[in-house]
Regions:
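Active-site beta-loop-alpha junctions enriched in small/polar residues
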Residues: 33-35, 58-60, 88-90, 115-117, ...
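Conserved, mostly hydrophobic/aromatic
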Residues: 30, 45, 56, 85, ...
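Alpha/beta enzyme core
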Residues: 97-110, 114-124, 135-213
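Glycine-rich, positively charged N-terminal anion/phosphate-binding segment
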Residues: 15-19, 24, 33-108
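Alpha/beta catalytic cores of nucleotide-metabolism and tRNA/nucleoside-modifying enzymes
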Residues: 11-24, 28, 34, 39-40, ...
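Short glycine-enriched, charge-decorated loop/helix-capping segments at active-site entrances
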Residues: 125-131, 191, 255-257
Length: 330
């Protein structure tokens, strides 16, 4: 029966909407990631085909306390819309207040982080830590939805561990709270990022006849081809790409790019980040992407040059290294 459903969904796919935001048919979304999804990177991901992008996730407590570095993460460019801002925290009142602050910069979506597994977040009862306290998680969701008029969405995981796979019931509960879409990462908190993402439960949530909100799948998607297989096999409304985008904004592109072109894209990302901040912060933001970019993987005798590239403190020095890489390898 599900095979027939998959064929039907593949042939008669309709545009995905979050509230009134039309993301088109089978959209790819950029996941919110701390120290990764800065504005320069988001702009490039958008250019290469991301239907929607998200800022770095931000702490509700830091927003309420007006911490300047956190407030800077709320900057949105008109050309990157639709864009979402994701917040995390464990207190309903502060999350609602943070959502009101976020709404003042007019994002298209406010997303609630109930999935981050790292110790500094989940260990304090926020992010995926809330999967151990569903009543509080739902209280936060209702409080935020009641505080803002912007569509509210949620990103979460399958459950805390394999003995507590709660996503099927949780999806219904979150929908009943009034969320506009749900993103599910196909791992538990205990798995962190180990093993492989299990899309089986994501597909079950999507097939649940009670569920009518968009379901976005996330986990181990590294290309458009893999995203297509996820759409075909599990029937999800959208696919979110996270770690595979590090240093690789072209992962959203429909056409294959050459390495020289990819290097030019990284150079543009560097320039955008420097222009929007300053040389020090622009290089710092870009350095993380250079360290992760697949175009530098496996280059022979590149170790010394790589260290120089990641230690460079001047834009011209990094661009000079790019030129050297072009001549030696591409």
């Amino acid at each position: 029966m599900w095979v027939v459903e998959r064929i039907f969904l593949s042939i008669f796919a309709v545009a995905m909407k979050i509230g009134s935001i039309n993301l088109g048919d089978r959209p790819l979304l950029l996941a919110p990631m701390e120290d990764v999804t800065d504005i320069g990177f988001r702009l490039l991901c958008k250019r290469f085909g991301a239907a929607m992008v998200y800022t770095e996730f931000v702490s509700a407590e830091a927003l309420v306390r007006s911490v300047k570095p956190t407030l800077r993460k709320l900057e949105i460019a008109a050309t990157e819309r639709p864009v979402g801002i994701q917040i995390y925290g464990r207190d309903a009142e502060s999350m609602a207040e943070a959502a009101r602050i976020v709404e003042s910069v007019h994002p298209d979506v406010i997303d609630l982080n109930f999935g981050c597994p790292v110790k500094k977040v989940a260990g304090k009862g926020a992010g995926a830590g809330l999967l151990q306290d569903v009543p509080r998680l739902l209280e936060i969701t209702r409080a935020v939805i009641g505080a803002v008029s912007t569509p509210v969405t949620v990103k979460t995981r399958l459950g805390w561990d394999q003995e507590h796979l709660i996503i099927t019931e949780l999806a219904e509960q979150l929908q009943d709270c009034g969320i506009s879409a749900l993103t599910i990462h196909g791992r538990t908190r205990s798995q962190m990022y180990t093993g492989t993402a299990d899309w089986t439960l994501i597909g079950e949530v999507k097939r649940n006849p009670r569920i009518h909100i968009p379901i976005i799948g996330n986990g181990d998607i590294c290309s458009r081809d893999e995203a297509k297989r996820a759409f075909d096999e599990w029937g999800v409304d959208g696919v979110m790409i996270g770690r595979a985008s590090f240093g690789c904004p072209w992962v959203f592109s429909e056409k294959e790019l050459g390495n020289e072109e990819k290097l030019e894209i990284l150079a543009e990302q560097l320039r955008i980040n420097v222009e929007r901040t300053d040389e020090y912060r622009g290089i710092l933001h870009t350095r993380r992407h250079l360290a992760a970019s697949p175009i530098f993987k496996g280059l022979p005798d590149f170790r010394k040059t790589r260290i120089e590239m990641l230690r460079a403190e001047k834009v011209e020095d990094i661009l000079a290294i790019f030129e050297e890489v072009k001549k030696r390898y591409f």
